Amino acid sequence: MTITTSEATSHTLGGPIRVMVVDDSAVVRGLETRMLEEDPAIQVVASVGNGQMAVQALDRHDIEVVILDIEMPVMDGLTALPELLRKSPNLKVIMASTLTLRNAEVTLKALQMGASECLAKPTTSREISGGTDFRHDLVEKVKALGGARRRALGRAAPTARAGGAVVERKVGALPSLMAQRAQQPISLRPAAEERPDIIAIGSSTGGPQALFTVFGDMRKGGWPSQPIVVTQHMPATFTTILAGHIERVAGVPTAEAKDGDPIRGGHIYIAPGDYHMVVETRGTEKILRLNQDPPESFCRPAVDPLFRSVAKAYGRRVLAVVLTGMGADGSKGGKIIAESGGTVIAQDEPSSVVWGMPGATAQIGACSAVLPLKDIAAYVLRSANKR
C-alpha cells in the first residue's frame, strides 16, 4: 500500500528563522544570541529580560520561535507562556531551565500548556559558553521548530543569510531530509498477525504531550496486559518527573527504569535521562539494562538502541510506535523491528510538532500505519488484544 505525504508549499515569508531570547541574565542572553546567530539560518530579532517584555515584543516583531527562561522577575516564564500563545497561537516556545526538580515540574507543566520543547540549560554562563551539547541542542531545536512552523503555515523554508542579504529558497528546493520526505510516497507493509508481547515507544520534540494523549486514550479504552517501554529524549531529572506525570495520566504503575528491572506486564518503564535503555533476556525472563554507551543521533537515551534490543528479545512479537520528534532516531531500529516481523507505526505529519523521527521511520519503509495522534491509542489496543 502506498500513501503520499502532503507536499510542503512556499512562500509569503522566507529568510532566517526569527527568534526571541528571554532570560533575566544579560550574559546568558548574549551567549545564546551569539550561538544562534552563528547559524546563518537563524536571526535573533529580540532579546529581553522578563516575560512581560517578551509579550510586549510580539507587538513589534514577527517572531517565530522563543527561548523562554522559567525564573525571571516581573513575569516568569510560566506566567508569560499563555500570554505569548494567546497573542501568537502558532508561536513555537522552547522552555529553557536548569536541571532541578522544581524546574522539571514547571517545564512539564509548560509543555502541557502549549510549549513545544524543553532545553536543559547549564547552571553557569561558563558552562553555557563551553558546552557543545547545549549549543547543538539550542540551534537544532530552533531550526526544527521554526521549519515545522513554516511548513504548517505554508511559508518559505528557513534560509541562510549571505553577506547580510537574505537568500531565499522555497521548501521544494531545500536540500534537507525533511523537505525531501514531504514529496516522497510512503510504502506501508502488512502488520504482524501475532499479538505483541511488548509495546515500545520512541518520542522527542512534542513527545510528552503526545505520550499524555496516547496513554490517556488507552486508559479510556482498557489498559493492555503488555509491558510498555518508552524512550523520550529528555535529560536526567526531567524523566523522573515525566514518569510521575505519565503514571497519573495512565493510571498504571510507571517508573524510570533501573538497571536489572524485570519487565512486568501492565507496567510502563521510562528510559532515564543520560542512559540508553535496552531489553535483555535472562533465562526465562526479560529484564531492562541501562548503559552509557555513546549517544546515538546526538541523544542519550536514544530510541534506536531500545528498538534494536526489543527486536532481538521478542522477534515478531513487538509493536513499536514512533511519535513526534526531530531527527531520525528510531528509524533504523524501527526498520530492524519490521524486518524481524514486528509491527511499527508512526504519528502523521499534521499532528506532529516536528515530523522528523516519525517521518524518517515512515520513509524508510518500516511502517504498517501512519496515523493522526488521536488514532494511535486505538491501533495499539487493537493490536494488543489480538487473539
UniProtKB/Swiss-Prot annotation:
It is an enzyme of class 3 (hydrolase). The keyword Cytoplasm applies. One of its GO terms (biological process) is chemotaxis. Disulfide bonds: none annotated. Its main location: cytoplasm. Phosphorylated by CheA. Phosphorylation of the N-terminal regulatory domain activates the methylesterase activity. GO terms for molecular function: phosphorelay response regulator activity; protein-glutamate methylesterase activity; protein-glutamine glutaminase activity. It is found in: Cytoplasm. Its EC number is 3.1.1.61, 3.5.1.44. Pfam families: CheB_methylest (PF01339), Response_reg (PF00072). The keyword Coiled coil does not apply. Residues 18-136 form the Response regulatory domain. One of its GO terms (cellular component) is cytoplasm. Transmembrane segments: none annotated. Involved in chemotaxis. Part of a chemotaxis signal transduction system that modulates chemotaxis in response to various stimuli. Catalyzes the demethylation of specific methylglutamate residues introduced into the chemoreceptors (methyl-accepting chemotaxis proteins or MCP) by CheR. Also mediates the irreversible deamidation of specific glutamine residues to glutamic acid. Belongs to the CheB family. This is Protein-glutamate methylesterase/protein-glutamine glutaminase 1. It comes from Rhodospirillum rubrum (strain ATCC 11170 / ATH 1.1.1 / DSM 467 / LMG 4362 / NCIMB 8255 / S1). The gene is cheB1.
